[in-house]
């Protein structure tokens, strides 16, 4: 009989040190980089911009109101946006 396999320790993820308030540099990065993303959602902004979820939702809402990005689909919790095509912008 084979020896009993030991349980792995599992992966330990470090606590995220994401920004919790907007400052000028974050706003500038969002306005410059996010409209170029093909797929835009709260989780994408949290991952790439290193901001927390509430800031990501505020940023997406602001970009959508200004017409920089457009909504593709809305799930019960997750909204998916994309960049505005160049022909309509």
UniProtKB/Swiss-Prot annotation:
One of its GO terms (biological process) is cytoplasmic translation. The keyword Acetylation does not apply. GO terms for cellular component: cytosol; cytosolic small ribosomal subunit. It is found in: Cytoplasm. InterPro entries: Ribosomal_eS25 (IPR004977). Its main location: cytoplasm. Component of the small ribosomal subunit (SSU). Mature yeast ribosomes consist of a small (40S) and a large (60S) subunit. The 40S small subunit contains 1 molecule of ribosomal RNA (18S rRNA) and at least 33 different proteins. The large 60S subunit contains 3 rRNA molecules (25S, 5.8S and 5S rRNA) and at least 46 different proteins. Component of the ribosome, a large ribonucleoprotein complex responsible for the synthesis of proteins in the cell. The small ribosomal subunit (SSU) binds messenger RNAs (mRNAs) and translates the encoded message by selecting cognate aminoacyl-transfer RNA (tRNA) molecules. The large subunit (LSU) contains the ribosomal catalytic site termed the peptidyl transferase center (PTC), which catalyzes the formation of peptide bonds, thereby polymerizing the amino acids delivered by tRNAs into a polypeptide chain. Belongs to the eukaryotic ribosomal protein eS25 family. There are 2 genes for eS25 in S.pombe. This is Small ribosomal subunit protein eS25A. It comes from Schizosaccharomyces pombe (strain 972 / ATCC 24843) (Fission yeast).
């Amino acid at each position: 009989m084979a020896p009993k396999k030991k349980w792995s320790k599992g992966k330990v993820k470090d606590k995220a040190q994401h920004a919790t308030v907007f400052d000028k540099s974050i706003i500038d990065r969002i306005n410059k980089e996010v409209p170029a993303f093909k797929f835009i959602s709260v989780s994408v902004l949290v991952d790439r911009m290193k901001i927390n979820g509430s800031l990501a939702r505020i940023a997406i809402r602001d970009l959508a109101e200004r017409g920089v990005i457009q909504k593709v689909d809305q799930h019960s919790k997750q909204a998916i946006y994309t960049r505005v095509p160049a022909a309509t912008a």
